[in-house]
Structures are given as structure tokens and as C-alpha cells.
């Protein structure tokens, strides 16, 4: 299957490279197209663009965990627009599925609304694709990671930096889940969150609902006459047991099926509101 691989952290993210390698290892064709800059927190936005009538696209060589390289597209656009451009044939034959990530930071709880990673996947659903957003629970408490979003324990090459996130753990779970998603009905959307730990330390994979809050939150650290200073910190607010945020903190990988934007059935006082219209709603 031809699968779009994208993210919101940008084309040079090692999480993106690990995800692309996992898709190829699972026997699929990876079309790697990701933003040329960081679009974390972009949700499903389509801009702004420097030029509304032109998007920059550059072919780049991307490193993958086995030491080889693959070709990708560095795109001057947010991830949701990249999904749209892929469907329009901007990167060759349109794909049949999209996987986005591996995000540097969790995407849990109702805060998933703001995720560019998930925005790319939900946009793909509009074109009839199934998709999966993948995020690694990289610590953000020191303010060094965006959080919007291989070591010997998981069979990959030795990690040169002990602080390097365990991208291989998330990649292994992608290879496990992907065959099911390929066989699932069209427009099936999954949100996968993985602990930042060796695969052997992950307690298991659990289906989970969305927590009221996500794993990280924005705080204002300063106010002056010219603006606000912001930071992103780990969310220490209590969350209900069994939700994605709670299970992830407890060492479980979590997977949550998501619905795209849809209408709900609510009884509205239409007759009362229509009375103010010239025709009275007739």
C-alpha cells in the first residue's frame, strides 16, 4: 500500500525518519512529505502560506535508523495541507493511507484538538483514507521539547546519546498495529501514544478514551506591555483512571479510535429562532 508519512515537527525530525522506516519494514511504500519547519500545534490548519498560490517543495535525503537514506519532500506547508496536496497528486500517485509522527511529545486527552499530527490524519480521512497518529511521551518538563507532539533493547542500533528518545519503541508498535489498520474499513482513524522507554519496559497496549486534559499544557510565565511569555510543561492535574493520559503516565502504550468532524443530533428551538426572520421560517 502507498502510505503518506508526515508530521508536524518537521522534515528533519528523527521520529519521522523512524516512522518512515517502520512503514517500509511493514512492506509498504512510504511517501515521506513533511513541513520544512516546525508546525507543532497547527491542528488541521491550511496556512498561512508565504504565497497563497505556491507551495515550496524540495527533495531531500533522509537518514533512517539502519544507516541508509530515503528520499523525502520538504514542504513549505502545515501537515494538514500536505495531506491535501498528497491527495491532489503533489508527490506522485495519491496515497491510500496516512501515518503521522512519531511526534516528540504526547498527544492525549482533549488537547488532541490542537495537534498538527492528528490534524494531518483527520484531513486524510476527508479523502477516504484511514490513518494513524503516533506520538512518543518525551518529557517536556524542562521546556526543551515541543510536546505538541533506537536502542539495543528494541533491536535497533545502539543509541549514541542516552537522552535520545526511544523512537524505535514507537516504530515497533507501528509495525504491530499497521496490518490491522490496512485491513480495517476505510476512514478508520487511530491515535497511538507510546511511553519513552525501551520496548521491554512498556507494560502493554491498552485501548483508552480521551482524558479531559492532555499530557502537557501551556502556561504564561511572564507578562509585559509588549506581550506574553509562554512555556509548555508536563500536566500535573489529576486525570480519570483508564484514560489515555493516565495510562500513558503509568507505563502503558495507548490506542484511541477517533471520529472526524461530524454533526451531532441536538434538539434546537428552531421555531422560536425563526420567528425573528422576515418569513417567519415558513
Predicted regions and their residues:
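Electrostatically charged, flexible surface regions
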Residues: 144-282
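Short, ordered loop/turn segments at secondary-structure junctions
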Residues: 35-38, 103, 136-139
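A cross-family phosphate/adenosyl-ligand binding-site feature
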Residues: 3-6, 13, 17-87, 93-94
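Glycine/threonine-rich flexible loop motifs
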Residues: 106-115
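Short glycine-rich anion-binding loops that position phosphate/pyrophosphate groups of nucleotides
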Residues: 9, 38, 78-79, 103-106, ...
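Proline-centered loop/turn at the N-terminus of a beta-strand
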Residues: 2, 29, 128-130, 188
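Short, acidic/small-residue loops that bind anionic groups at enzyme active sites
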Residues: 114-139
Amino acid at each position: 500500500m502507498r502510505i503518506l508519512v508526515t508530521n508536524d515537527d518537521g522534515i528533519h525530525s528523527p521520529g519521522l525518519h523512524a516512522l518512515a522506516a517502520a512503514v517500509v519494514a511493514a512492506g509498504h511504500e512510504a511517501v515521506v512529505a513533511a513541513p520544512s519547519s516546525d508546525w507543532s500545534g497547527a491542528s488541521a490548519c491550511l496556512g498561512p502560506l508565504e504565497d497563497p498560490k505556491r507551495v515550496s517543495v524540495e527533495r531531500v535525503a533522509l537518514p533512517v535508523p539502519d544507516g541508509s537514506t530515503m528520499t523525502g519532500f520538504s514542504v513549505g506547508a502545515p501537515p494538514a495541507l500536505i495531506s491535501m496536496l498528497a491527495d491532489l497528486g503533489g508527490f506522485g500517485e495519491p496515497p491510500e493511507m496516512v501515518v503521522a509522527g512519531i511526534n516528540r511529545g504526547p498527544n492525549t486527552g482533549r488537547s488532541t484538538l490542537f495537534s498538527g499530527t492528528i490534524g494531518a490524519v483527520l484531513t486524510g480521512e476527508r479523502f477516504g483514507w484511514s490513518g494513524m497518529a503516533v506520538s512518543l511521551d518525551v518529557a517536556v518538563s524542562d521546556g526543551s521539547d515541543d510536546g505538541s507532539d533506537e536502542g539495543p533493547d528494541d533491536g535497533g542500533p545502539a543509541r549514541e546519546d542516552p537522552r535520545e528518545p526511544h523512537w524505535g519503541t514507537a516504530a515497533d508498535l507501528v509495525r504491530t498495529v499497521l496490518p490491522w489498520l490496512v485491513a480495517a474499513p476505510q476512514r478508520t482513524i487511530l491515535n497511538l501514544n507510546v511511553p519513552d522507554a525501551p520496548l521491554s519496559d512498556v507494560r502493554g497496549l491498552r485501548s483508552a478514551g480521551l482524558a479531559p486534559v492532555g499530557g502537557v499544557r501551556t502556561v504564561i510565565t511572564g507578562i509585559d506591555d509588549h506581550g506574553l511569555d509562554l512555556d509548555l510543561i508536563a500536566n500535573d492535574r489529576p486525570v480519570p483512571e483508564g484514560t489515555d493520559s493516565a495510562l500513558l503516565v503509568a507505563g502503558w502504550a495507548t490506542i484511541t479510535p477517533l471520529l472526524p468532524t461530524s454533526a451531532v443530533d441536538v434538539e434546537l428551538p428552531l421555531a422560536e429562532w425563526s420567528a425573528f426572520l422576515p418569513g417567519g421560517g415558513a
